[in-house]
Amino acid sequence: MKDFLKQVSDQETKKLLELATLALETEGDFVELGCYRGDTSLLLEKLIENSKKSKKLWLYDSFAGLPEKTKEDASVAGDEFKASELFVSKREVVERFKKTGLKLPVIKKNFFENLNPETDLPEKIAFAFLDGDLYSSIKTSLSLVTPKLSDRGIMLVHDYNNPKLPGPARAVDEFLNKNPNFRLNLFETLAIIS
């Protein structure tokens, strides 16, 4: 749990679970783009199972670490994460689920830009946690999730207020400029889009 808290704070975890609980009443499945070790994935699956709702959790990750940064990721606050950093194997995530006894989610191994929205994503999405750390990953995640987001669906983007990772904020701000019907609320480093 210690490594997880370095990535997502206690307060952010509580907010994520609070919003995911609200999304249980919304049509569609839960998705997480950028699952890393599966910490939030385990929490989301447990929430779904405890709710007795017929929802699935879908996880997406390259399981090859981060892609190369782009100019949109340049930060004057210092450098955080390099290409291939945050590497965790798909097998490790699967094993973590098996150890907990939770149902294994749908797990797709690929870089986000290689996903096919028609075949790789659920038909409807109630809740999306986007944790790709970089501009291109968040921009692509938003473009994949938005057409499938249910009315009252919720998207959370991690690292919005992280000065060492400005890419997510740039991607979210561009998205909101093109999609003014969405609202943005901020909580620590989470961008809450609904």
How does the language model describe each region?
Residues 1-194:
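A short alpha-helical cap/connector motif
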